């Protein structure tokens, strides 16, 4: 059994330190601002867990200052776009770039920038934001054999998730407020047998250690309203009880050590995308369009 302490400490430090991001250029004003037009010293905060493997890698980051993560209404103008390079941390060689990421903030008080990069080798890398420090923020690409959570290209394992008809010992089956969400009508096992694409979210709106689970569920609910006939949408909680002291079986079945995670499969149950830690409805829609599922 995974303890709450192990589960929480296994997650990335959402409010932890990052690399200082310093520029002296004046803000350009409006939503057209870019990373080269920020005027104050900021930090890069990694918004991703250490489960990245070679291939197309998603690298979401946020910006912070000495007072914490920057929000949309915090008085600091946040760039609409960031530009970066990925470099080998040992040699300093640029391996990917330049790449850009748009700001995502739909339904979120703290926006993020989801970079995408094709990194084909195991190792330690840094993401260097234009206008930022020379050391950037670290990225570790792991050997897939060392990662136990389902990866893109692998089959999503069947699991009898709690439903409104059978909570399977999980109470409540959903901590979304003001009432349980509508994504608990079918088990993951049964959904995999339908031969339809699946969006499977594991996260807890009420007890999320990163503060992103409730917005993630709200984003998924928005998407499900449009695609409920062509895809199956399922939500599972992180904890067995509302006391948030016992990790739910759904978490152990996936070997998760962070939250939330959204697994998207094709009609054969193969994971074609996994969004970790932070995402909004716009990014989910973009992913589904890219995958040809919308």
Q: What is each residue range found by the language model?
A:
Residues 193-207:
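Short active-site neighborhood of thiol/selenol oxidoreductases, capturing the structured segment around
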Residues 10, 36-193:
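Non-globular targeting/processing and membrane-anchoring segments
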Residues 238-258:
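Thioredoxin-like thiol-disulfide oxidoreductase module
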Residues 276-294:
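Thiol-/selenol-based redox modules, centered on thioredoxin-like
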Residues 260-273:
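A short, hydrophobic beta-strand/beta-hairpin element that forms part of a small beta-sheet core
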Residues 24-36:
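Bacterial lipoprotein signal-peptidase II cleavage site
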Residues 6-27:
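N-terminal export signals
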Residues 211-225:
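Typically the conserved alpha-helix immediately C-terminal to a functionally engaged Cys/Sec
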């Amino acid at each position: 059994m995974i303890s709450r302490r192990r589960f929480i400490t296994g997650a990335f430090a959402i409010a932890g330190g990052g690399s200082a991001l310093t520029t002296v250029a004046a803000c350009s004003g409006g939503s057209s601002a870019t990373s080269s037009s920020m005027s104050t010293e900021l930090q890069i905060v990694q918004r991703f867990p250490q489960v990245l493997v070679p291939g197309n890698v998603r690298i979401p980051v946020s910006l912070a200052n000495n007072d914490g993560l920057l929000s949309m209404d915090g008085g600091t103008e946040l760039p609409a776009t960031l530009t970066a390079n990925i470099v080998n941390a040992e040699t300093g060689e640029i391996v990917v770039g330049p790449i850009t990421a748009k700001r995502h903030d739909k339904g979120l008080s703290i926006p993020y920038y989801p970079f995408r990069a094709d990194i084909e080798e195991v190792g330690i890398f840094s993401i260097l934001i234009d206008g930022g420090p020379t050391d950037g923020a670290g990225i570790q690409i792991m050997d897939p054999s060392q990662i136990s959570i389902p990866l893109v290209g692998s089959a999503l394992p069947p699991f009898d998730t709690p439903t409104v008809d059978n909570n399977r010992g999980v109470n409540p089956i959903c901590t979304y407020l003001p009432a349980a969400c509508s994504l608990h009508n079918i088990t993951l096992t049964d959904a995999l047998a339908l031969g339809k694409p699946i969006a499977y979210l594991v996260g807890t709106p009420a007890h999320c250690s990163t503060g992103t689970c409730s917005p993630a569920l709200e984003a998924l609910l928005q998407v499900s309203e449009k695609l409920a006939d062509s895809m199956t949408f399922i939500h599972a909680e992180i904890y067995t009880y509302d006391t948030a002291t016992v990790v739910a079986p759904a978490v152990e079945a996936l070997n998760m050590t962070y939250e939330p995670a959204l697994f998207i499969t094709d009609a054969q149950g193969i994971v074609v995308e996994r969004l970790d830690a932070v995402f909004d409805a716009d990014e989910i829609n973009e992913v589904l369009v890219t995958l040809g599922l919308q």
